[in-house]
Amino acid sequence: MLAPVGVVLLVIAIGTAEDSGWAQAARDPSTDQRYATALKTAKRVGKPTTTTTTTTTQPATTTTQATVIESYDAVPFAADSPWNSGLGAGALFRSTSDPMTTNLRSSTWTPWVNAGQYSHPLIQASWSDPVVSMTCDYISGVGAGATTQFRVPLNATAAPGTDGHLHVINPERTQVVEMFQVRGSGSQRTCNYLVRNDLRSSGFGAGGTRAHGGSAIGGLIRSNELDGTPIRHALAVALSAGQLKQGFVWPATAEDGDAQWSYYGAVPMGSYLAIPLSVDVGALNLTPEGRAVALALQRYGAYVVDRASGVMLYTEPSLEGSSELDNLRRDMRTLVGQLRIVANNSPQSVNGWNP
C-alpha cells in the first residue's frame, strides 16, 4: 500500500470529516437460508458518540487485554451499505476481453493477502479500558495538531510498517476511531491522522484513512471468517499502479494524491468487482479458505479501495502465520482469474441491483 502520500494530500485537500450500526447481514442474492435468516434479524444500535473526548463514570483499569470485535456474526455499517448489499440480480459484467478485465488479470506480481505490514488491526474497546490521549498531526473535523481522548486497551498495537494503522471500536459499538501512522504506547500516543467513522453509516465518504476516501475497516476479512463462518460482506481489494486508472468512481471519493502521474492502468479507484454467479466455485479446486472467499466474491463482491504492489486482499493481523491464511494465499491467482468488473454499479444501481 502506498497510502501515505494519498492520505496526507487528502488531509490537505479536504480538511474536514465527514446511516445505521452493525448489520448482521444484508440483501443476499443466494438462496442460502442462513443468509435469509440473518437478513431478517439485522441489528440496529443507538446514536453515535460525536464528541472528541470520551468521558464516563465507569471506572478505568490498567489491567487490559486487547481483543478484536466479539460479535463476529455482525458486520460494520448499514444494511444497505454497498459493503453489505450483496451482488445485484441485475449486475452487468464487463466481458473477459474488455480492457479493464484484461488489465485486472494481467499483473505479473503474485496476488496476495496482507495480514502484517499495511494491514488493519481492529480492536474492540471496553468500558474498563483506560482513556488514552492521542495527539495527531491532523484530526478530521477538528484540525491540525489536535489531541483527543478515547478508550483503548493499553497493549493495543498498531500494524508494523510505515502505515501503522490502528482502529478502535468504542464500547458502545457505534463508532470506529481510525488512525494512520500511530506511534508510541501506553496512555500517551501520537498519530499522523485520525478520523471517527459512524458504524451505522455506509462506510464510504470523505475523510477516511484509505486511499478511496472511506473507512479502512470496510471489507476486512476477520479471523473467524476463514474457519467456516460465512463472509457476509464485500471485500476490500487493492490494485497496483499499473492496474489503477486516474479518476475515481462511485462510491470512492478520493484516490492517491499522486494518481495523475503514478496510475497507468484501466481500473478506477472505487470499481466494484465480483465473480459471476455462472461460475461453478466448486469446480475451481480451491482450499476451504479459498472457497469461502470465492463465495464472498460471488455473493458480495469486492471494492477497489487502495494501491498496493498487485491485487491484494486484507485480513486481521492475527491470521498471519496460520495455515488458513497460507491456503488462501495459494488460491489467490485462481480467484483473481475469475473476477470481473460490474459495469452498472452506481448510486441508482448499488452493486448492480438495477440493470
Language model region names:
Residues 40-48:
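Fungal extracellular serine/threonine-rich, low-complexity, intrinsically disordered "mucin-like" regions
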Residues 10-39:
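C-terminal region of N-terminal signal peptides and the immediate post-cleavage residues
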Residues 65-355:
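Short, surface-exposed polybasic-aromatic patches that bind anionic ligands, especially phosphate groups
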Residues 1-6:
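N-terminal export and membrane-targeting signals
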Residues 7-8, 65:
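Generic short amphipathic/hydrophobic targeting helices enriched at N-termini
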Residues 48-67:
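Extracellular mucin-like PTS domains
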Residues 32, 58-60, 144, 187:
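Intrinsic-disorder/low-complexity loop/linker signature
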Residues 8-17, 48, 116, 155:
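Compositionally biased, intrinsically disordered low-complexity segments
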